[in-house]
Amino acid sequence: MSTDNTMPIGQLRWDATSARGPRATNADATAGRTDPAAGRWAFAVADGVGDNPAAAHAARAAADAAVAATAADPRGAILAAREALADQPDTGDCVLVVAVAGAEHACEIAWVGDCRAYLWADGALRQLTEDHTLAVYFRTRNLPVTPGMDHVVTTSVRTAEPALIGRTQVTLRTGRLLLCTDGVHKTLPAARLRSILERAATPADAVADLVDAAHRLGGQDNATALVVDRTADHAANSSAA
């Protein structure tokens, strides 16, 4: 199911899609907010913890609150999402990745849990985030990892504290930014992610192909992807001519 939100903002275009897959509930959510006049934008992908309506409500509330936050620091967007869930005690919990416009061509990214951000640019795919999972915690300390640890998150929106929120920055002059849930990145190998992002003509094509590929490869989770394309000024001007 596409969210049907491809739209231009200067040289920026984006789209998102999400599919329930074999789960009973689609507990993933996406959100985007753009301000062409100010050159500001924010995008979020959330994954509810669990397969139930409470998890779905948490993901939706968190994603919406994150992109509505006015802070340029994406950690502020995560904390705004935390406050939104605190106001809804009967709602569940979720993990979240947020990307916001920074100074010049910077893209500021923050996350809790195992939603990811990738950048496809100059013929290469870079994973920008590091999963907050028990498996990563053990691997970074050279401790043995047991099956299932990749699916146990160590941070979430409800437990978010400034010091625990992941943060990174990347220059986005041209390229393709991907935000996705683990239903995509834990199912598709990096080579498959790269090939889809490379060949897709538009963000709408990219997200549809990513989610479809995840389920065709036997993914057992909700699958959600949001793609943002940034093109150079001269390319945008040429296409508008």
Where in the sequence are the language-model features?
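PP2C/PPM-type serine/threonine phosphatase catalytic domain
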Residues: 1-241
